[in-house]
Each structure stands twice: as C-alpha cells, then as structure tokens.
C-alpha cells in the first residue's frame, strides 16, 4: 500500500510538472496578461495535481521512513525524462539515459527495504 501511495504521489507531481510545461508552451508568442494566464486550464491542472500530490505525499510519510521514501521520489526524474522524450520530443543523450538507469537501480535497492 505504501509503495502504491508513493507511486501515486510521483504520478501526481509529474502530472503537475507536465501541465506546467503545457501551460507555458501555450503562452509562448502570445501577448497575454497575468489574468489571461490565470485562466489557463493547464495552470489549474498543475496546481490541482501538485496540491493533491502533496496530500498523498503526507500519507506516504505517515507510512514510510523519510530516508527511504524521499529518495524514491527520484522516480520523478525517470518519468519526466520519458515524458520529455516521447511527448515533447526532446533529445535525451546517452549519459542522461545512463543516469536514468542508475536511478532505477537505486530505487529497486530501496524498494527492498520498504
């Protein structure tokens, strides 16, 4: 249950980051006021998902040691890298992929402790 909550917290925070990216991309090249930017559905999705992610994270901290749970949030690095590559078509070099593999290895080691 704790690992599922941790994955949910990761998913929600990643969704928030991706929604922020979509929000700023939608503003690019458009002269818009702060009020117009506040009307962005992407911005509100980002705020909602990050807020909900925080609440889920608090549940995680009630169930897991912070020394184990927090490093496992590095899964966000993996998820965001995949989204950057496949959704935003960003180039990811070999060193970056190697870093992703190391993060996955570290999370697997930590998950045995959880």
Swiss-Prot record:
- Membrane-crossing residue ranges in chain numbering: 41-61, 68-88
Please verify whether the record's keywords include Aminoacyl-tRNA synthetase: no
UniProt feature coiled coil, ranges: none
Query: Which biological process terms from the Gene Ontology are attached to this UniProt entry?
Result: lipid A biosynthetic process; lipopolysaccharide biosynthetic process
Which compartments does it reside in?
Cell inner membrane
Q: What's the subunit arrangement here?
A: Heterodimer of ArnE and ArnF.
Q: Which HAMAP family match?
A: Flippase_ArnE
GO CC terms in record: plasma membrane
Pathway linked to the protein:
Bacterial outer membrane biogenesis; lipopolysaccharide biosynthesis
Q: Do you know which InterPro entries this protein is assigned to?
A: EamA_dom, Flippase_ArnE, Small_drug/metabolite_transptr
Write out the similarity annotation.
Answer: Belongs to the ArnE family.
Keywords in alphabetical order, please: Cell inner membrane, Cell membrane, Lipid A biosynthesis, Lipid biosynthesis, Lipid metabolism, Lipopolysaccharide biosynthesis, Membrane, Transmembrane, Transmembrane helix, Transport
Q: What is an example of a GO molecular function annotated in this UniProt entry? A: carbohydrate derivative transmembrane transporter activity
Q: Which gene encodes it?
A: arnE
Q: Organism, per UniProt?
A: Pseudomonas fluorescens (strain ATCC BAA-477 / NRRL B-23932 / Pf-5)
Does the UniProt entry include the keyword Repeat?
Answer: no
Q: Which domain of life is it from?
A: Bacteria
Q: How does it sit in the membrane?
A: Multi-pass membrane protein
Record-given protein name = Probable 4-amino-4-deoxy-L-arabinose-phosphoundecaprenol flippase subunit ArnE
Q: Which residues form the EamA domain?
A: 43-112
Instruction: Say what the protein does.
Output: Translocates 4-amino-4-deoxy-L-arabinose-phosphoundecaprenol (alpha-L-Ara4N-phosphoundecaprenol) from the cytoplasmic to the periplasmic side of the inner membrane.
